[in-house]
Amino acid sequence: GETVAWTRTDVKDGHDLGLKVRASSTMPLFMPPTTIDGHTYMDGGMGDSWGILLNAARADGYERFCIIRTQPRGYRKHAMSRGAQALFRAAFRKHPIVAERTIARWQPYNELCDEIEQLEKTGAAWVFYPDTMDVTNKTTDYDALVRSYETGLAQAQRDIESLQTWLG
């Protein structure tokens, strides 16, 4: 449950970058863990940041934040069913912290979403929310992924002026 953030200087080459991207996006149960330099990585959204490095940016002295969300405005996670909780506990009996943090993730994630919305209201954050999200993190249909990319690109081009205004 520890957050690791890599910077440009931590990446040796394209292969190393690929490993680090995979490590940060690995989903428990759906993908195997990634091992880098003897350390096992399971999910970029499991550490203290819950996948959004707002506190790391604050620690670096930033007071304004440009945040790119992957879910529409208002999206919140829900508590896992008891059956799903039992599945995670069984699947990760050798790594109980993975199970427990995944099971409990919805509450701190939702609190972080609330905080981001507050920052946006005060002008301390500019947040890009996709108008729609027609794919999931398990989508493998190439055409659906291309359509989603094109939809997101069109929205970003539409919204760029708003970001430029916020940046001043």
Predicted regions span which residues?
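Patatin-like phospholipase
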Residues: G1-G168
